[in-house]
C-alpha cells in the first residue's frame, strides 16, 4: 500500500509534466497564429522561421511525452489513473503534429499564385478559432491540479469553439468550390483548411481525455 502523501506527490509530478506538454503546444499554436499574417505579407523569411520554430516545439512535446511515459512506468500502480494520463499525453502530442503540419503547408503557400480572394480572411478566422481551442485546452490542463471540477466545466468552452470551427470549415469548403476557378487553388487551400480542422478535432479529443482524468481526481 502507498501512503496518501506519496500518491499525491506522484500525481502532482505526472500532472506537472502534462502541463508542461500542453504549455509547449500552446506556444506552437501561438506561432501558428503569427504564421498567417506573415503569409499575407508575403514574408517568406518569417514563414520559414515560424515553421522551423514550430517543428522544434513538436520535438519538445514528444520529449515531454516520453518523459511522462518513463515517469509513469517508474511510479507504477502509485498513479491509479496512469493509462488515462498517458492517453491524454498522446492526444496533446498529436495536436502539436497537426500544428506543425499546418505551419509547413502555410510556409509553402505561394500567395502570388492566387488571385485576391476573401477566402484567405476566412481561413485566418478558422486558424484563430483553432488556436483559441489550444489556449482553452491549456487552461483545462492547468486546472487539473487546482480544481478538477473547473477543468470539467472549462471543456464545455472547447466544445463550443469546435462547433464553430466545424461550421466555418463546411462553409469555407463550399466557398472554395464556388469562388475559385483553379483546381490547384482549391486543392491547396482545402488541404490547409483540413489540417487546421484536424487540429481542432484533436483538441476536442484531448479535452475529453483530460475530462476522464479530472473525474478520477
Place the predicted regions along the sequence by residue.
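Cytosolic, long alpha-helical scaffolding segments
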Residues: 1-217
Amino acid at each position: 500500500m502507498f501512503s496518501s502523501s506519496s500518491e499525491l506527490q506522484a500525481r502532482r509530478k505526472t500532472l506537472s509534466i502534462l502541463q508542461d506538454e500542453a504549455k509547449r503546444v500552446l506556444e506552437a499554436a501561438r506561432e501558428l497564429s503569427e504564421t498567417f499574417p506573415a503569409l499575407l505579407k508575403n514574408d517568406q523569411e518569417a514563414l520559414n522561421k515560424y515553421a522551423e520554430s514550430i517543428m522544434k516545439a513538436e520535438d519538445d512535446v514528444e520529449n515531454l511525452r516520453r518523459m511522462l511515459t518513463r515517469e509513469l512506468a517508474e511510479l507504477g500502480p502509485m498513479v491509479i489513473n496512469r493509462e488515462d494520463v498517458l492517453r491524454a499525453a498522446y492526444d496533446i502530442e498529436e495536436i502539436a503534429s497537426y500544428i506543425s503540419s499546418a505551419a509547413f503547408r502555410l510556409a509553402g503557400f505561394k500567395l502570388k499564385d492566387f488571385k485576391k480572394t476573401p477566402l484567405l480572411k476566412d481561413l485566418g478566422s478558422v486558424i484563430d478559432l483553432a488556436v483559441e481551442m489550444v489556449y482553452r485546452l491549456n487552461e483545462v490542463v492547468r486546472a487539473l491540479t487546482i480544481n478538477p471540477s473547473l477543468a470539467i466545466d472549462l471543456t464545455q468552452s472547447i466544445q463550443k469553439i469546435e462547433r464553430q470551427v466545424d461550421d466555418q470549415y463546411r462553409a469555407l469548403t463550399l466557398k472554395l468550390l464556388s469562388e475559385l476557378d483553379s483546381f490547384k487553388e482549391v486543392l491547396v487551400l482545402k488541404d490547409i483548411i483540413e489540417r487546421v480542422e484536424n487540429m481542432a478535432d484533436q483538441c476536442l479529443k484531448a479535452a475529453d481525455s483530460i475530462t476522464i482524468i479530472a473525474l478520477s481526481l
